[in-house]
A protein has these predicted regions:
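A short, well-structured juxtamembrane/interface segment
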Residues: 25-36
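S-adenosylmethionine/decaboxylated-SAM
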Residues: 2-20, 34-289
Length: 290
């Protein structure tokens, strides 16, 4: 059963206070890919995130939204999934604790919420236009069948040269993600550009110029190790970000004062040594008289 609440959710004081798993190396790569797209006006399109949790990566991604574009986030937010994904229930806004947390977190950094589709990611292809997205972050279910469906939707929604990021690509507890992504490389013409310790980045467009520019940028980064291997007939850039220095984080719209710590009680006054010794002597003396 989903957990609902009407109580206000306190906003985070800063980006580091938003719960989630979005490591510095991937923040750097999101920043690099999205800023690169700004250099090519013809690479217009919307932003899409499948799976949001409490919004850490969505907050980051939303900062690259350009005028006239739309940012869509699709997540169940702990609401029950109906048997019929096309039912009217899919458009209901369940006030779950997770969704309220996402909204409070996102609005702490942005004036407006993204378009929220509170539904299984299997519906997203029916909600957006084909070839409409320039950047897609797939971070929803870890089950192979679901990830495979998310990849199919991403391929349909991705515009020319769109970048697609896949989370938990190398996590030992998520073999279905790796299987689905490599399956897409083998059978769906997905071209991987690079991988980090957690994510894979690819495109259905021309990967070669992106890969070449990324390699030049990586040469300038002393905090990122990288190597290139031939995998499935194409170069794949491996990136180690253990020492990565994250880019400047998104800044809250309105500074939030950290919660005040409750005042500590004053320590009790110490008992004078002489008085305590006298009390002990009287107690012992009374015992002897008995």
């Amino acid at each position: 059963m989903s957990q609902t609440t009407s109580a206000p959710v306190p906003p985070p004081a800063g980006f580091s206070d938003v719960k989630g798993w979005f490591w510095p190396a991937d923040q750097l790569l999101f920043d690099w890919f999205l800023k690169r797209q700004e250099k090519f006006p013809e690479q217009a399109g919307d932003l899409l995130e499948l799976g949001a949790y409490l919004g850490k990566s969505a907050i980051f991604t939303g900062g690259y939204l350009r005028p006239g574009e739309e940012f869509t986030v699709c997540d169940l937010f702990d609401s029950p999934a109906p048997d019929d994904p096309n039912s009217a229930e899919m458009d209901r806004s369940y006030s779950t604790l997770t969704r309220r947390g996402f909204e409070a977190n996102y609005l702490a950094f942005h004036e407006e919420l993204p378009t929220i589709v509170q539904a299984p990611t299997s519906v997203i292809a029916s909600r957006l236009k084909p070839d409409s997205c320039r950047f897609i972050h797939v971070d929803a279910s870890h089950l192979y069948e679901h990830v495979h469906g998310d990849i199919e939707a991403a391929r349909e929604l991705a515009g020319p040269d769109a970048i697609v990021a896949f989370d938990d690509f190398r996590a030992e507890h998520c073999p279905g993600v790796a299987a689905a992504v490599w399956g897409a490389v083998a059978t769906m013409e997905l071209k991987l550009i690079c991988i980090t310790g957690t994510k894979a980045y690819g495109t259905w467009g021309d990967a070669e110029p992106v890969r070449a520019e990324l390699l030049e940028w990586l040469k300038s980064r002393t905090d990122l190790w990288h190597g290139v291997e031939e995998v499935a007939g194409a170069p794949l850039i491996r990136i180690d970000g253990k020492k990565a220095k994250a880019p400047a984080p998104p800044r809250p719209l309105r500074p939030v004062a950290p919660p005040e710590r409750p005042a500590e009680p004053e320590p009790a006054a110490p008992v004078p040594v002489a008085a305590s010794q006298g009390l002990l002597a009287r107690v012992l003396g009374g015992r002897r008289r008995r």
